[in-house]
A protein has these predicted regions:
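A general structural motif
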Residues: 1, 31-35, 60, 83-85, ...
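N-terminal pre-triad scaffold of radical SAM enzymes
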Residues: 1-9, 78-108, 118-128
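Core AdoMet radical
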Residues: 5, 37-41, 102-153
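Beta-hairpin (beta-strand-turn-beta-strand) motif
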Residues: 41-43, 68, 91-93
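Short, charged low-complexity linear segments at domain edges
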Residues: 65-85
């Protein structure tokens, strides 16, 4: 399925493939798409995301809004879908319940280990809370990368 992904703003992590957009539908035409996902990372981008959703709905294809700003549990990680290639998420959640952190509430207070995909920029909520086996596998994957690892959390 061809899915256009729309982001309210461009960041270093925004995908840069032909189906990733940071504004209204382009006037010069659009590849055949079957669905549009408006991905919202920050709550302060909600108003712009709603405007973009209305603009993209005019194409007549299903448009869905989602992302971290909605405070819903994260799903499986698909490389390149909502984050530029090179960024990886190998686990979601955290078993700690720090008063200042929304991760345990968002992810249900548990840690989920995900399949490990190739990349060098690790965005896990709490990688060190994972099993030793998972951490070792992540470090082995990082050892295969041409770029040095970056842990941004």
């Amino acid at each position: 399925m061809k899915i256009a992904r729309v982001f309210p703003r461009r960041t270093k992590a925004t995908p840069d493939d032909p189906l990733a957009f940071t504004g209204p539908p382009p006037k010069g035409g659009l590849p055949d798409i079957e669905e549009v996902h408006v991905s919202v990372a920050f709550t302060y981008d909600m108003e712009k995301a709603c405007q973009l959703t209305e603009q993209w709905m005019k194409l007549g294809v299903p448009v869905h809004m989602g992302g971290p700003a909605f405070n819903m549990p994260g799903g499986d990680f698909v490389p390149g879908m909502y984050l530029k290639k090179g960024y990886v998420i190998t686990s979601r959640g955290c078993p700690n319940r720090c008063w200042f952190c929304s991760v345990p509430r968002r992810e249900g207070g548990r840690l989920r280990e995900l399949p490990i995909t190739e990349g060098n920029i690790v965005l896990d909520d709490n990688l060190l809370a994972c099993s030793r086996q998972h951490i070792k596998a992540v470090f082995e994957m990082l050892g295969r990368q041409k770029e040095r690892p970056i842990f941004t959390g």
